Amino acid sequence: MKNKEIIINNYLNLENNYIKLPKKLFSEQNPSEVPSTNLVVFNESLASDLGLSEEFLQSDDGINFLSGNKILEDTIPIAQAYAGHQFGHFTMLGDGRAILLGELKSQNGERFDIQLKGSGRTPYSRGGDGKATLGAMLREYIISEGMHGLGIPTTRSLAVVSTGEDVIREEILKGAVLTRIAKSHIRVGTFQFISNYGTIEELKALADYTLNRHLKKAEYEGNPYIYLLNEVIKSQAKLISKWQLVGFVHGVMNTDNVTISGETIDYGPCAFMDVYDPDTVFSSIDINGRYAYGNQPKIGVWNLARFAETLLPLLDEDLESAVEIAQNSISKYSDLYNKYWYTGMRAKLGIFNEKEEDKELIQSLLTMMKRFKADYTNTFSNLTLGNLSDIDMFASKEFKMWYEVWKERLKSQNQSSEESKMLMEKSNPTIIPRNNRVEEALVAAIKDSDYSVMQSLLDVLKNPYDYSSINEYYSIVPKSTSCTYKTYCGT
């Protein structure tokens, strides 16, 4: 491994416990050096939350650290190995352009990974150059921070540094490195890798590390690996329900993009739905709609079944019994997902308690929204405001009948209309990272080096549930529909 310039580490207390795992799970790898560095965007609030020195990170040494030009003393950067099912096909993968610099403990004792994306080739790069484009890294920064503002578990973005490099794709583009923060980068694909290429002892070592890092041992009795499986199923059911509730389409739900921590990861071909349509697909390579908006819950359980398969040797010594345990756990996913999603949809309609007829109320509204091509976000925010003039569907006889049924449902509960409105305000964002506004910010940044448009967008995305000062510019529905917007796996 090539020697790197060292920064005397008086600012960040990084560890790397991952290297205590079997060595086939990673490769020691320094980031590549870049010709020039410019700190394009820096997340001061995240740095503060993590207890990081903002002064150091914005200094010359700090920017060199964030670009990969320098590493901290006594740290061992690594690239992680993993496998995965990509569009249903199993393949060997790994960090092809990402380097894990280390782990830090936040002020409340929680452990986080610090990873550089676009930091050069690794042993897992296959034919790639290991680099990333400025546009793709800024896009991940915007959308991941938007997801955080929406209250959805996600990896975070600490900084983007432009590198002065030309990155060759279909055209020559500006290069950049993004600093990603995650509770960990352990994926379903990590378990698939060790299950296929390691021993049972190595699988157990990974599972034990995961339990120690993400779950409290005191919380379970009996077989800890059954507990691990059940907790991952629960966290993924909850995560995907949150995606559905805000109209988020991930676009590349391969098993290597399913985190054990329950965080959203990989913002390549993702986007937010404008017009409500379960068949919405944005990814240019998802030609069969495998990862369409309406398919995401089903893909979630498919991915979790792949995770359960990796744990079979740890669930029970008898294979038949292990399979039965796994199937029993997986069978709980549907009820868990429906519980989280219906609870969320009731909240979007100001409903506190549960009644069976709520399902029909919710589904009939969604059916109307699809037929009238209603904007998903604005339908619910306008219902929250009581504004029934801005959406064509609201003038229909069918909607007026639905509206009366909904109002009667609200009257049937103990909470007041004001309490229902407050619940709706907490559940229905007025602002999402709309595709047209994200693109507008990226064009200004990349073509004109004007980052003010992006900063304005980031500012409003911090408070998407603020009904006291709605910024209409960011809530206007674009004239073109969701179907015309295409995304690419740039990140």
Swiss-Prot record:
One MF annotation (Gene Ontology) recorded for this entry: AMPylase activity
Sites where the protein binds Mg(2+): 257, 266
Keywords carried by this UniProt record: ATP-binding, Magnesium, Manganese, Metal-binding, Nucleotide-binding, Nucleotidyltransferase, Transferase
Catalytic center residues: 256
Residues annotated for ATP binding in this entry: 94, 96-97, 117, 129-130, 180, 187, 266
One Pfam family, short name: SelO
UniProt catalytic activity: L-seryl-[protein] + ATP = 3-O-(5'-adenylyl)-L-seryl-[protein] + diphosphate; L-threonyl-[protein] + ATP = 3-O-(5'-adenylyl)-L-threonyl-[protein] + diphosphate; L-tyrosyl-[protein] + ATP = O-(5'-adenylyl)-L-tyrosyl-[protein] + diphosphate; L-histidyl-[protein] + UTP = N(tele)-(5'-uridylyl)-L-histidyl-[protein] + diphosphate
Keyword flag Transmembrane: no
InterPro entries: SelO
Obligatory cofactor(s): Mg(2+); Mn(2+)
EC number: 2.7.7.-, 2.7.7.108
Role of this protein: Nucleotidyltransferase involved in the post-translational modification of proteins. It can catalyze the addition of adenosine monophosphate (AMP) or uridine monophosphate (UMP) to a protein, resulting in modifications known as AMPylation and UMPylation.
Family assignment from sequence similarity: Belongs to the SELO family.
Protein's name according to its UniProt entry: Protein nucleotidyltransferase YdiU
Species per Swiss-Prot/TrEMBL record: Clostridium botulinum (strain Alaska E43 / Type E3)
Gene, per the UniProt record: ydiU
